[in-house]
Amino acid sequence: MKLLERERADLERYLPGLDGLLAETSSAELERPGSPGVKMFRDAGGPALVIPIEYKGLGADPVAAVRIQRAIGSRSPSLAVATTMHHFSVSSLVLLAAGGGNEWLLLEAIASQRMLVASGFAEGRPDGRILAPTMTATVTDEGLRVSGVKRPCSLARSMDLLTASVIVPGTDGQGDQLGVALIPSTDLGVSVTPFWASFALGGAESDQVTVDNVLVPNDLVVPTGPADGAHLDEIQTAGFVWFELLMMGSYLGAATALVERAIAVDRVADSEKLTLVTGVEAAMAAVENIAHQIPDGQRDERLLADALLVRYAVQDAIAAVVPRAVELLGGVNFMTSDDVGYLAAAVNGLSFHPPARAKMAGPLMEYLTGSSLRIA
């Protein structure tokens, strides 16, 4: 068995030909703005990956999904990060459809038409209030008039739909609640402008999306949970679990790409190689443990707490493994190929995704002493 063999086999099983295309395309091409990676993913049927077969999807379970993200991350970190945002958005729609909603119609359209869904939820907010709405919404007889800005927004230039968090009137008539507005990218009120300036993850299309007074019909607005900005309902909890799971797999893939290069170097001692492999494989085992629990426990805050603890442990594993892999690869590899330096930079992205460790230290310790989990 080779490192990443299992993950690449799952990628080939669900999205035939994609791994080969990514492998034969240079990292420089895949990681630049305007990367062909997103189109490759779409053409391979990737938008349907986590959509159940009953909704015309491919029906990948959480374990297969996270392995596939790791495989993609080892070829193109940008593509792995970008597609995680699609899968995260779709997974929430799957849960809503399972509750008897009409979301199944949208899921069938996403799967059959290979539509990409971008997430307009509050990543990258300096105040850290990641559950607070990213958009303002005004109630009208026809639906909601939505306006706002999301930056960065992965898949900004390839998306077919944007999911945006908004405040909507409560279904029980008692106050407001959070909701998700589904906004077609073709609406004249939706525009995309440059935002991402870093060389790292440039292929993820993480630019600015502006929504200007877009009318969203009521049937494309889905109430989700409380509007207090801290506590989650079951749908939000499950969405966060999926988000953390797939992001961990994506960045572990990028880290493993460096390990894969290092263990191929003859002069590196077996003991050093084993240390690198142990680091990434132990981290992946912890991630897969979360994935195995998702079918029965994804709505449970306990699993989300476990996912966050594993996520911060994965960050530490990456921080330990990657510098050592770069050192063992040596100066010649670093100087003669951009790939080593690029991967070493890209893996740091995991620590920037919400919720940050420093923000969650207090809430997690409160949770571990008996309080409900809140998201900071």
Where are these regions (language model features)?
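C-terminal helix-coil-helix/basic helical segment that borders enzyme active sites and/or dimer interfaces
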Residues: 19-29, 263-267, 282-316, 323-334
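Glycine-rich, charged/polar anion/phosphate-binding loops
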Residues: 149, 168, 193-198, 241
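Glycine-rich beta->alpha junctions and the first turn(s) of the following alpha-helix
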Residues: 196-281
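DPxDG-like acidic metal-binding loop motif
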Residues: 149-187
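Glycine-rich flavin
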Residues: 33-43, 48-154
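Generic structural signal for well-ordered, non-transmembrane alpha-helical segments
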Residues: 16, 253, 274-284, 308, ...
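Buried hydrophobic positions in well-ordered alpha/beta secondary-structure cores of metabolic enzymes
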Residues: 68, 146-148, 211, 255, ...
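Glycine-rich phosphate/cofactor-binding loops in nucleotide/flavin-utilizing enzymes
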Residues: 331-376
